[in-house]
């Protein structure tokens, strides 16, 4: 049974919802799944002014904070981040930047990797974000899994990974589940 880590950053809960759907899909694909979040770097007094964050704070904080060194313990890692100015959030970037030792020791080489994102605007740079998130995975020598052509992709997601605009709709969640299941199936074949 493949072990999969779904790791995400979210402030308003949209990326968290996608993370949960990705995890459901991976479980459906037969994997053992852990869902964790990256450390939040925005000061609490600023976060508390964001009504979207206040609504989901307790649920977000219920997820364990991941440590970079634990990535090597999984067969597959699926990263999720909100889109910020066409790239991943600084919190996710900082977390990935802390994997330098794993890179030097080639600890993630051959592991399966995939990505997902959410943003607030239809043309807010989701595909650019997905691509920016894939680059470090390539650098680590990970085996990248995207989404094959499917009717669900016509309205939600991308070949590069799952995505949503605003609160994920049902088709967004279906594509996220598809991604999780596909990663689980590929990881199982490689284990």
UniProtKB/Swiss-Prot annotation:
SUPFAM superfamilies: Flavoproteins. Its EC number is 1.6.5.2. Binds 1 FMN per monomer. Its cofactor is FMN. Residues 4-184 form the Flavodoxin-like domain. FMN binds at residues 10-15, 83-85, 118-124. It seems to function in response to environmental stress when various electron transfer chains are affected or when the environment is highly oxidizing. It reduces quinones to the hydroquinone state to prevent interaction of the semiquinone with O2 and production of superoxide. It prefers NADH over NADPH. This is NAD(P)H dehydrogenase (quinone). It comes from Archaeoglobus fulgidus (strain ATCC 49558 / DSM 4304 / JCM 9628 / NBRC 100126 / VC-16).
């Amino acid at each position: 049974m493949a072990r999969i880590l779904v790791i995400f950053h979210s402030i308003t809960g949209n990326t968290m919802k996608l993370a949960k759907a990705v995890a459901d899909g991976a479980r459906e694909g037969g994997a053992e799944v852990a869902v964790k979040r990256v450390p939040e770097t925005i000061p609490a007094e600023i976060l508390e002014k964001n009504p979207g964050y206040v609504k989901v704070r307790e649920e977000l904080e219920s997820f364990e904070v991941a440590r970079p060194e634990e990535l090597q313990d999984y067969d597959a890692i699926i990263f999720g981040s909100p889109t910020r100015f066409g790239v991943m959030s600084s919190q996710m970037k900082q977390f990935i930047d802390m994997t330098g030792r794993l890179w030097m020791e080639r600890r993630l080489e051959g592991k399966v990797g995939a990505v997902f994102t959410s943003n607030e605007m239809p043309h807010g740079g989701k595909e650019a974000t997905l691509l920016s998130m894939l680059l470090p995975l390539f650098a680590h020598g990970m085996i990248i899994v995207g989404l094959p052509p499917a009717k669900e992709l016509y309205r939600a997601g991308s070949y590069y990974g799952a995505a949503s605009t605003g609160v994920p709709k049902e088709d967004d969640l279906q594509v996220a589940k598809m991604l999780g299941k596909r990663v689980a199936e590929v990881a199982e074949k490689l284990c």
